[in-house]
Amino acid sequence: MSKISRQAYAEIFGPTTGDRLRLADTELFIEIEKDFTTYGEEVKFGGGKVIRDGMGQSQRNYKDVMDTVITNAVIVEHWGIVKADIGLKGGKIAGIGKAGNPDIQPDVTMAIGGATEIIAGEGMIVTAGGVDTHIHFICPQQIEEALMSGVTTMIGGGTGPAVGTAATTCTPGPWHIHSMLSAADAFPMNLGFLGKGNVSLPTPLEEQIHAGAIGLKLHEDWGSTPAAIDNCLSVADRLDVQVAIHSDTLNEGGFLEHTLAAFKDRTIHTFHTEGAGGGHAPDIIAAVGQANVLPSSTNPTRPFTVNTLDEHLDMLMVCHHLDPAIAEDVAFAESRIRRETIAAEDILHDIGAISMMSSDSQAMGRVGEVIMRTWQTAHKMKVQRGSLAGDPARNDNFRVKRYIAKYTINPAITHGISHVVGSLEVGKVADIVLWKPAFFGVKPSMILKSGMIAAAQMGDPNASIPTPQPVHYRMMFGAYGGGLKTSMTFVSQSAFDAGIGDMLKLNKPVVAVKNMRHLRKRDMIHNSATPKMEVDSETYEVRADGELLVCEPAKILPLAQRYFLF
């Protein structure tokens, strides 16, 4: 058999087993663990290439071939970092392996035929679409911004630029929930809405779940008291929905211990389990040590930099309807911004104690920067703390798997949607993001929704080829008309059973959430650590299993000015 050099092979078909890639301008390196191809039988599209009639393309009928094949892609997933062809059929992932013509090629697991489209994955990294579970639906323009960053699922609450929405992620009551479910039809994004959980009697909460809310949000601005927490979790247990909480910063209704006691060991998603986002001051971060708590943090403090503290005070005053002329409001804001706990947040992410990353969109967080901030945090921790125990010196595969799980599979598991989204696995919806390695984590090349291209970098539409400037993100056919049906609207099981889609005449597919109430921290993939936490109420020092968590703020970050003109 003829041979070519490893470099030449990578230039033609992309890297293979043992090759390494640098992720953008970070200090993170991945190494291909396995290549599913058969060497010498690779498929590639183009003039003089393999995927031609009677060669790499078979004569098989539509039902026996893929709708789309992404060829020779590097897949970065919580389950592995591999090279493979990805086959899509009916909007779902139908295969990860070797594509081609099974009539003449060996080891083919996915047939290419006359009904098959090809997306070139050579030299590209492919990931699952991101899942952002901390959305304040303040304006619809957030959705396009998030999509262009690689996020394909948004979960949260709100009704627009009302003060309640600006501060809390709640869509309160059946009328607002139905209105937002109807509005969701217009967007190329999977959407799910959280109702208001701050009620001490069950009926107002049950009404919201039956109306279609996929969960309930407890927020201190509505009063996260032990009574409201207990009632909310009781309703959630009965109706199989998730509860998210932003706890009591001022410790008015109780301290952290009282809130944890109100949980009664029941599953809960704790928002802002972090350094400055809100919740019991100063020790909400200690909740990461609880076996029933599924913790997330938001991107305004990700990662800790020399500018983090300075920008937070003004952001906080605006988001929570505070008045800088009122001393008590200023004191409230200042109590939430703590250098020590922000630094600890970096390390808790790195050891897998904080399980998820999210945005807190327009409510201190930036909706288009969840993925970017995740990888900036991973880079900062690599530089400051070295390789993780599971990584050899030559790659950061385990760290990369840990961090990608924070914005893909773990939030999907937490909110009961991992049976359809959150990872690249056979049978799941084909919400897929393609990246050039030099732009990984910051600027995707193409975003697919249920196998249809919904957004991409695209040049001048009047040019003779697709690449002339200005090249920028543009909506593609999957974002228009019937193409919007490639996105889903998530609802509760009770609303699904009642026929909420037909009742509201929704056009997008309606999918029920499920299997959340049994979850434990151990179910958070690569992010299940439950260290014994201590937070000093005077100095704000944070310890995990007795170790003081300290790190310096970053002065320079990757994925930053190098990639943006403005």
Swiss-Prot record:
This is Urease subunit alpha. GO terms for molecular function: nickel cation binding; urease activity. Ni(2+) 1 binds at H134, H136, K217, D360. Pathway: Nitrogen metabolism; urea degradation; CO(2) and NH(3) from urea (urease route): step 1/1. One of its GO terms (cellular component) is cytoplasm. It comes from the Bacteria. Heterotrimer of UreA (gamma), UreB (beta) and UreC (alpha) subunits. Three heterotrimers associate to form the active enzyme. Keywords: Cytoplasm, Hydrolase, Metal-binding, Nickel. It is found in: Cytoplasm. Carboxylation allows a single lysine to coordinate two nickel ions. The active site is at H320. InterPro entries: Amidohydro-rel, Metal-dep_hydrolase_composite, Metal_Hydrolase, Urease_alpha_N_dom, Urease_alpha_subunit, Urease_AS, Urease_asu, Urease_asu_c. Ni(2+) 2 binds at K217, H246, H272. Its EC number is 3.5.1.5. Belongs to the metallo-dependent hydrolases superfamily. Urease alpha subunit family. It catalyses: urea + 2 H2O + H(+) = hydrogencarbonate + 2 NH4(+). Its cofactor is Ni cation. Substrate binds at H219. It holds the Pfam family Urease_alpha. The keyword Lyase does not apply. The modification N6-carboxylysine is found at K217.
